[in-house]
Amino acid sequence: YTCFTTDVIHAGHLNIIHEAQKYGDVVVGVMTDKALVQFDRFPTISFYERKKMVQEITGVSEVVEQDSIMYDTVIRKIKPDYVIHGDNWCKGPMKAIRENAKKAVEAYGGKIIDIPYTYDPQIKELSRKMRARLAMPEYRRKRLKQLLGIRPIVKALEVHNGITGLIAEKTVVEHEGRLDQFDAMWILLREILVLVA
């Protein structure tokens, strides 16, 4: 089992699939919009488009819905022998996700397999372009409307300079096995308050 949180399949994802095939049938979880906004960023395509994209990857046996950033519920449901992920989840806030998956899979004798993370300048550039696309005003308005429908509480931070903007954008906090981050930032421009989601 592995899980994808992406709008675009790149070499790193294909590497995970290739490595996972060595252990048997590959089941891929696709995070729902609700889970994705808690984990990484707002999706640029719908859950169903992401699911279809993953289903079309050679080597994927089955695609399942993952409705949480934590893996325990889906692991208990499908009981994979292995949970395979890039080793980027071994440190930082993502470590809580790994620990959650490890506890769930080891409860019945399964194993975690950490694959060396694929560092590629093209992947970094792709990520930068996706974030730039999400920064366009028409996407921000659309995202805010969607976010208000997905999240019971939208967390925003008032930003008044570049540093506080980066804090709002980059901060991810792990607390008691859960990850959290800001959903939006309030920007005060010449007495006009703007919400950027």
Name every feature range the model reports, one short phrase each.
Residues Y1-P137:
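Nucleotidyltransferase catalytic core that binds NTPs
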Residues H13-K22, G162-Q181:
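Short amphipathic alpha-helices and their capping/turn segments at secondary-structure boundaries
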Residues V28, K155-N161, D183-I187:
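Hydrophobic faces of well-ordered beta-strands that scaffold small-molecule active sites
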Residues D33-L36, G162-G165, L189-V194:
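Short active-site-proximal "capping" loops at secondary-structure junctions
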